[in-house]
């Protein structure tokens, strides 16, 4: 290891060596979630207070005990990614500055057919834990009704992840369709509590059943991943009978070490619960085509971009989240008469996928502000361009956009 005594989490005083020892202790569970899968390396080389960068390609000088798999991407590029198969591989990943593990939903032996369907229950601002749990229970029932078993874990942030082992018979498009059908059925059974709407400003104070984590090239923080929060929180597998009574903040490196030592991994049986997508794909046929864009949406501005049906204004585009929150505070200070009308869900701070790191977009939905009092779209308080110089012609407007990251997904 390099710099084993470097403090990674100042609040609990955890060093780089502490993180390696943690992953060695929970290796059985961590490898059950991430082992044998190509993974994106999310490297916090400047600490948890700085933005990480995402490295798809495995370092050339990787040790012999790190396998690799070459993935093909939508733009015609490819990347040889790391495949961890043992505890030594986990230690190597941490030594690179990775905190959480971000594997693809495929095995290295078959890169075209996922063996795991993933659902991220992502709460909008203003949603409490009990509502997230209510939606999780509905999702569990929908899965069971269609012959599948959902395995819950905390996301390590505010939400819940449901993992579903499936037969590797379907391609990414079919798996995503099955997940989308699950999300739509959850929304139908829990109206007002859950949303399958893709456009964030239309979800209100609901739990977004994020099916798009099943798109190709997406990854999700896997079980026992340490998340970049000050308390060293862990994405922790749960039994269904403890989902309602536990809270994400209870699960940190220290408490999960004790929990794992006492009871082992609640997901120990996940690989024995492999199911078929036939039921969810039949549900997709019954539900019919999903709504491609909200009613009234238009692309008639000549840009090819979707025009929201909501009265949105954009506040800023920034390189880091602290800069985004600072811009939001400045906008609120300049518009004090608007702030009392805003609900938590009206303030949209989105992490956006750049080429190798996240950038942030700040928008405000003025739907609850009286029309006469709505401010006009003005100049952005910050206008960071993550694509500048990376595409022919300069800015990213000519080269494509990365899209937003909901919950804990990584592109």
Model-based region annotation:
Residues 1-14, 20, 28-31, 35-36, ...:
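C-terminal accessory nucleic-acid interaction domains of nucleic acid-metabolism proteins
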Residues 297-411:
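Acidic/polar low-complexity segments and flexible, solvent-exposed patches
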Residues 1-90, 94, 299:
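Charge-rich, low-complexity segments
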Residues 82-155, 166-174:
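Signature for HUH/AEP ssDNA processing cores
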Residues 161-167, 207-211, 358-364:
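A short beta-strand motif that forms the metal-chelation/ATP-contact edge
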Residues 41-44, 150-156, 197-201:
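Short beta-strand
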Residues 147-153, 194, 343-348:
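A short linear hydrophobic-aromatic micro-motif
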């Amino acid at each position: 290891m390099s710099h084993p005594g470097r403090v990674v989490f100042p609040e609990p005083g955890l060093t780089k060596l502490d993180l390696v020892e943690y992953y060695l202790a929970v290796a059985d569970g961590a490898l059950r979630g991430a082992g044998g899968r190509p993974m994106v390396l999310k490297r916090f080389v400047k600490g948890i207070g700085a933005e990480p960068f995402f490295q798809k390609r495995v370092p050339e000088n990787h040790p012999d005990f790190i396998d690799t798999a070459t993935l093909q991407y939508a733009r015609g590029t490819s990347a040889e990614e790391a495949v961890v198969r043992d505890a030594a591989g986990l230690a190597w990943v941490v030594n690179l500055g990775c905190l959480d593990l971000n594997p693809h939903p495929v095995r290295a032996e078959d890169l075209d057919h996922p063996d795991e369907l993933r659902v991220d229950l992502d709460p909008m601002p203003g949603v409490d834990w009990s509502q997230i749990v209510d939606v999780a229970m509905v999702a569990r029932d929908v899965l069971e009704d269609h012959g599948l078993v959902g395995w819950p874990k905390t996301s390590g942030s505010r939400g819940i992840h449901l993992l579903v082992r499936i037969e590797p018979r379907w391609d990414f498009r079919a798996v995503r369709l099955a997940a989308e059908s699950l999300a739509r059925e959850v929304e139908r059974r829990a109206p007002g509590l859950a949303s399958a709407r893709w456009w964030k400003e239309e979800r209100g104070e609901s739990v977004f059943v994020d099916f798009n984590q099943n798109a190709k090239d997406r990854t999700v923080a896997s079980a026992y991943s340490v998340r970049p929060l000050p308390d060293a929180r862990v994405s922790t597998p749960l039994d269904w009978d403890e989902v309602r009574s536990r809270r994400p903040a209870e699960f940190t490196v220290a408490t999960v070490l004790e929990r794992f030592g006492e009871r082992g991994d609640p997901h120990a049986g996940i690989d024995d619960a492999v199911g078929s997508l036939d039921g969810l794909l039949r549900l997709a046929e019954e539900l019919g085509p999903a709504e491609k864009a909200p009613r009234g949406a238009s692309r008639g501005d000549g840009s090819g971009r979707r025009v929201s049906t909501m009265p949105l204004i954009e506040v800023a585009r920034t390189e880091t989240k602290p800069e985004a929150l600072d811009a939001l505070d400045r906008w609120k200070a300049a518009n004090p008469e608007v702030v009392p009308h805003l609900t938590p869900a009206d303030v949209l701070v989105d992490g956006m996928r750049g080429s190798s790191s996240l950038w942030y977009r700040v928008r405000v939905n003025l739907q609850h502000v009286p029309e006469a009092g709505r401010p006009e779209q003005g100049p952005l308080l910050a206008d960071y361009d993550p694509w500048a110089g990376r595409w022919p012609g300069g800015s990213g407007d000519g080269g494509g956009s990365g899209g937003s990251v909901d919950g804990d997904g990584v592109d």
